[in-house]
Each structure stands twice: as C-alpha cells, then as structure tokens.
Amino acid sequence: MSRELITKYPQIEDYSTIWMENITHTTAKGSSEFGLSNTNKLIRQYEYATGLKTGSTSGAKFCLSATARKDGVNMIAVVMAEPDSKTRIKDAIAMLNYGFGKCSIYQDEKALEKIVYAEVKHGMQEKAKGETLEGFRYVDTSGSDLSAVEKEVQIQKQTAPVKKGDQIGEVIYRLNEKTIGSVPVYATEGVGE
C-alpha cells in the first residue's frame, strides 16, 4: 500500500515530511490556532527519511511504514507490533540501513548520447531519425561493480512506411555479459513510401 501511495502520489512526501505545523481552526465562534506535530519521529532522527505513516492501537501495538531515499534509491520499511515508539523507530532505521547497504543503483539518464538513424528501404528518405524517451535504471543487490555495465545500441533496418513513434531499435544494457535491461529507440519522424 505504501509503495502504491508514493508511486502514484509522490506529492505525499511534501506532507509526510512536515515535522510541525500551526493550524488555524475557524468556527462560527471564532478561530483558534494550535500546533500539530508529526507522530513519525523518524523524519527528525534519520537523515534519509521521506515519511510515511505511523499507527498504534492496543491490539496492533506500535506500527510504522517508513520511506527513505539515499543516492537515488527509495526504500520502504514496515514494522508492526513493536512494544513502543522508540523500538519501532530503531527497527525501521536498521531495516533501511540494511536495504541501503545491499542496494546500489546504475542510472543512465540519457540512453543515447548521439542521434541515431535507421536505414529505410523503399522510403522517400533513406534514413529515419531515432531517440529514446526515457533513461535507464537498474537496482543491484549482488554487490556487483556497476562501473562494468556496458550498453549496446541496436538499430534495425526498416521498410517504409515508418511512422513517428515506431520502435526502430533498442539500447541494451549488460553486466558481466548478462542482459540487465533495455530502453526502446523510437522514430522521431515518419518516412513515407
């Protein structure tokens, strides 16, 4: 549920990281101001914390769905049925630190460093220009040296007509000769017959 919330509604972070806020309550009898503080003490105690939600009842005890971001990696730690608030924070920090210690991320914001072209047979032009619409991200948990990631641009020959937006190739990423992902290359212009 936490992953869905932060993925679909990233603006939740703007609210869940507020430590303390003064609220003005206005009624027919007038207005009064009161301070509202966040029950998620993690946001004050852990430098990478980005939120999210605490809860406690006599049956469920102390629970926390904690989110944090470090070096471009987002983590979620969920602790339930803790005996007290301090323990839930301590255990969430331990889980987040463990996750950050095990994960590293490879990012290639610009999959193509130069303009690429696909050959077009029977077209009004001989080539179709291509580009990627997104970068590439890979999360590694094996401890591999991510500086060893290699990428290869593969562009396929096309037969006219080629429509703008047609996939004409891909950028393939490999680590230790194993494919770890790819990014499609799309035609940025159409080529008629």
Q: Predicted segments — roles?
A:
Residues 2-193:
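Domain-terminus/edge residues, biased toward the C-terminal soluble/receptor-binding domains
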